[in-house]
Amino acid sequence: MTAIPITRSSIAPERQQLIRQSVRSAAAIMTEADNSRLAQADDAHIFHAFLSDPDIHAPIYTLPRPLNVDAVRAFIADHLAQRERGEGLLFLNFDASGAISGYVDIVIWPQWAAGELGGAVGKARQGQRRGIEGARRGFDWMFDVLGLDLICETAALDNIRTAKLLDGLGFRRRGEILSEREDGTTRPSLVWEVTRSEWDAYHRR
């Protein structure tokens, strides 16, 4: 059983179905400027090329290992199946030239009206306010479009950039867990959470 979210508040089956349907209906995620769409099987080569930069893939424990085109294709197929169940989404973001500028990997726990947003942005966007603004828009979208009550995030203990981002966006630190990769290896991770009401108050929505 997953170690996250830490906070688990069960919701009515009818509301769970509404969340699942919102996930199944999602075709793009709100971004600051880039175009977004669902990842498809024929994106495997370009997505693999984007992920091949160690600075992008190394910190992300949810990516397949070894990281090759076939593994990326299977990763996309798994997320399309998750979407059909109403439990996950994988979006690719594209810049004005049509190149991948980032991706968004969303896990949904409909039974708790909770979710986790992961992914990465290309080097051109790293270290800029655009990355922070993009994360904020993504969290807004999860609350507003998917109808979630809670967002839970994790990061490696030495991932200072993500820690600063989450702290600065109003998330609460909830402790440490042992995250497990698909290949069975593990890493310690810090955990943050924020409820919809906390998010709305912090960002004056």
Where are these regions (language model features)?
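A generic membrane alpha-helix/interface feature
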Residues: 61, 71-73, 86, 120, ...
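Conserved GNAT-fold acetyl-CoA-binding loop/helix
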Residues: 57-78
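Short, hydrophobic secondary-structure boundary micro-motifs
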Residues: 58-60, 88, 201-203
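Hydrophobic residues in alpha-helical segments
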Residues: 51, 60, 83-84
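Secondary-structure boundary/capping residues
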Residues: 56, 65, 85-88, 151
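A short helix-loop-beta-strand connector motif used in the catalytic cores of GNAT acetyltransferases and
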Residues: 78-92
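Acyl-donor (CoA/ACP) binding surface of acyl/acetyltransferases
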Residues: 1-55, 93-205
